[in-house]
């Protein structure tokens, strides 16, 4: 018997008996499993206005910040009202809508809800207007704004300084009707430089305050050529005016005086539209042609109506309204002599001062008493001329009285 075979069979190692069970082997080798992750915190419930947002047609976004209940907005939608419908409604129509809501659904509106609905509608209107204004501003900056046919027909790229040369070259130089005080030209040049520097510092996009409308008339003689850009850059402007007789159509690239007076009638129509819009919105209603009217005209496409030009010739329009026969006679006389529009404009002051002299020198009362002139501010230069002539007349009267009394004084 082979001893090696015996020992091998006796001490043969059984690997199946020596190996632990598979489960225990895995338990010993595999690392311990991490604990399961904690459950995420429960999401907060969305506000009531975010539920079924599409069913309210946008009312929830407009009413959410004004304390209006979701049920109230839902019932307004059930009545068939949308955001666009509410924005186009007047205040009395909104009151009727809220009364109908209370009567039909027997839903009592809170006092704050009644005011909140109107406040939300006004805020939405302002937001839409601001967006429209920004859009128009971007388009105008890009040069893509389209002028209407009337303004495009009479536009040119000639330098803005031409009208200033016309006024400087007008006839009758050196008279009191051209300048109120001596040295006025130098003062205007100094003021013009100050205005240019001041506007460069403030930026050309800053708009003038409407509360200083009447005070800003002082600069009408040089502000006519410096609109918007502070006199820094040339702007697209209308063809210059020429003196024409009543009913005469200007030839070539010119505009007649009948067209000029028609622009003032258009301004009156724009003022009426602005007043109607302000009444519908419950806002302050302007009574005179202010910056608000000029901005409205520009938005409506009538960019050929601008403040400097309309203020520059307002006294000419006043003479046309107060004494049309005298205005027509003046136009014919200057047309026959071949005078330019600057000379005609200066000559329009004298008949107005004569009219004021016959009515107690109260030029403001004359303007306010006329239906077509009451919407315009009295030009500062016209008021100064009336004051100057009144002072001269009073001085002459006092001199004549004192001179007549000297002869009767006793001689020592």
Swiss-Prot record:
Q: Name one GO molecular function term.
A: DNA binding
Biological processes annotated in GO? regulation of DNA-templated transcription
Note the superkingdom of the native organism.
Eukaryota
InterPro entries xrefs: FLO/LFY_C, FLO_LFY, Floricaula/leafy_C_sf, LFY_SAM
Main location (coarse class): nucleus
Subcellular localization, as worded in the UniProt entry: Nucleus
In what ranges is there compositional bias, type Basic residues?
Answer: 187-196
Site residues, Interaction with DNA? 284, 291, 295, 342
Q: Where is the composition biased (Acidic residues)?
A: 206-221
Tissues where this protein is expressed: Expressed in the floral meristem and also in the vegetative meristem.
Provide the residue span(s) of the region labelled Disordered.
1-47, 154-234
Q: Where is the composition biased (Pro residues)?
A: 31-47
Q: Which residues bind DNA?
A: 237-241, 306-313, 377-380
Record GO cellular component, one term: nucleus
- Could you list this entry's UniProt keywords, alphabetically sorted: Activator, Developmental protein, DNA-binding, Nucleus, Transcription, Transcription regulation
Read off the PANTHER family from this record. PROTEIN LEAFY
What family does this belong to? Belongs to the FLO/LFY family.
Q: What does this protein do?
A: Probable transcription factor required for the specification of floral meristem identity.
- Name of protein: Protein ALF
The record lists the lineage as: Eukaryota, Viridiplantae, Streptophyta, Embryophyta, Tracheophyta
């Amino acid at each position: 018997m082979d001893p090696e075979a015996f020992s091998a069979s006796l001490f043969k190692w059984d690997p199946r008996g020596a190996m632990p069970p598979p489960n225990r082997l895995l338990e010993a080798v595999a690392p311990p499993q991490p604990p399961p992750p904690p459950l995420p915190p429960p999401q907060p419930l969305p506000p009531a206005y975010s539920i079924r947002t599409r069913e309210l047609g946008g009312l929830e976004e407009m009413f959410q910040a004004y304390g209006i209940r979701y049920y109230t907005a839902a019932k307004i939608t059930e009545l068939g009202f949308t955001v666009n419908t509410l924005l186009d409604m007047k205040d009395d129509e909104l009151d009727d809508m809220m009364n109908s809501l209370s009567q039909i659904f027997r839903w009592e509106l809170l006092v704050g809800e009644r005011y909140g609905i109107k406040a939300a509608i006004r805020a939405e209107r302002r937001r839409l207007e601001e967006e429209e204004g920004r859009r128009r501003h971007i388009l105008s900056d890009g040069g893509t704004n389209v002028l209407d046919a009337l303004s495009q027909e009479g536009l040119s790229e000639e330098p803005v300084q031409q009208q200033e040369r016309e006024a400087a070259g007008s006839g009758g130089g050196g008279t009191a009707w051209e300048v109120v005080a001596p040295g006025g030209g130098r003062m205007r040049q100094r003021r013009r430089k100050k205005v240019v520097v001041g506007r460069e510092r403030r930026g050309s996009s800053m708009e003038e305050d409407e509360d200083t409308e009447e005070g800003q008339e002082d600069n009408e003689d040089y502000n006519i050529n410096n609109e918007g850009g502070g006199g820094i850059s040339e702007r697209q402007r209308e063809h210059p005016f020429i003196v024409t007789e009543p009913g005469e159509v200007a030839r070539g690239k010119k505009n007649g005086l009948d067209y000029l007076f028609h622009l003032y009638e258009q301004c009156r129509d724009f003022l009426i539209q602005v007043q109607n819009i302000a009444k519908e919105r419950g806002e302050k209603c302007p009574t005179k042609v202010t910056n608000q009217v000029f901005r409205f005209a520009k938005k409506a496409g009538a960019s050929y109506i601008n403040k400097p030009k309309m203020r520059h010739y307002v006294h000419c329009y006043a003479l046309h309204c107060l004494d049309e026969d005298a205005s027509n006679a003046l136009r014919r006389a200057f047309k026959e002599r071949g005078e330019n529009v600057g000379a005609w404009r200066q000559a329009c002051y004298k008949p107005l001062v004569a009219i004021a002299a016959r009515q107690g020198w109260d030029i403001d009362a004359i303007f306010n008493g006329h239906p077509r002139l009451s919407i315009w501010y009295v030009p500062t230069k016209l008021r100064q001329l009336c004051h100057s002539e009144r002072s001269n007349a009073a001085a002459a009267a006092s001199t004549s009285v004192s001179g007549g009394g000297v002869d009767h004084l006793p001689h020592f």
